[in-house]
Amino acid sequence: AMSTIIYPSPVFGPVHSRRLGVSLGINLLPEDGKFCTFDCVYCECGFNKDHRPHRPLPTREEVYTVLEERLKDMHENGPHPDVLTFAGNGEPTLHPEFAGIIEDVVRLRNHYFPEAKISVLSNATQVLKPEVFNALLKVDNNIQKLDTVNPDYIELVDRPTGHYDVQQIIDQLKAFSGHVIIQTMFMTGSTQGKSVDNTTPEFVEPWLKVVQEIKPRQVMIYTIDRETPDHDLRKAGKEVLDRIGEQVREAGFEVSVSY
């Protein structure tokens, strides 16, 4: 049995994190399964095939109502959230009402906790949709995944479920004009007998070149930390992550490294 995580929907937490402070989670995906355009071998929610959802996506109205209730309660009784984070069982930007939900959340945040930030954790597959792109410009932390720029590695590790053209995605990430945080998972080990080590210069150098083209506000480097559905994956070591982080810093970008 895998100890993978399925998040309640549409609001969960708050979770206290060293990096983010008090984070209230918003899960726009079904609470009984996983809904994603990637099927990453390292996903803490498990493989798509093992978690097919049967419940519907929460509606925009439902998200608004539940979130307002929680924010009202936190306003009266604490704790005050530092950040409202769109995360959960898959890809939040897949929700057909994503843009409207972002508008609502911005409005609720401004009313109850104007100092709180809004973060979206995304795999970047939907940034080509204008309504998603424009909605992401309205959030404080637009966090987009780019594990590598190598198409074969993406097929092996991120396993897109539909058409995925990394160059198209990169061009669209550049179009954020710096209003984007790039998040990259580094690891070693293997999957299906093939190496997944993307910490070598062969992977890091082209990735860093693309980071310099995208010009993000920040780069988040991390490695696997919870149980993964594929047991042959290994964490990238602290020294390795620090070395990559240093290269990003030398290139002129703010960087956060999580071990």
Report residues per predicted region.
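Auxiliary Fe-S-binding modules of radical SAM enzymes
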Residues: A1-R19, T65, K72, T188-Y259
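N-terminal [4Fe-4S]-dependent radical SAM core
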Residues: A1-V41, G46-P58, E69, D73-P79
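Generic detector of contiguous secondary-structure segments
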Residues: I6-Y7, H51, F86-N89, H163-A175
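Short hydrophobic-acidic sequence motifs that mark active-site Asp/Glu residues
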Residues: S23-G25, V83, I143, I181
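Short glycine-centered, acidic/aromatic-flanked micro-motifs in structured strand/loop junctions
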Residues: L28, F86-G88, T184, T223
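Conserved Radical SAM active-site core
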Residues: Y42-K138
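Conserved AdoMet/S-adenosylmethionine-binding subsite of the radical SAM
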Residues: L94-R234
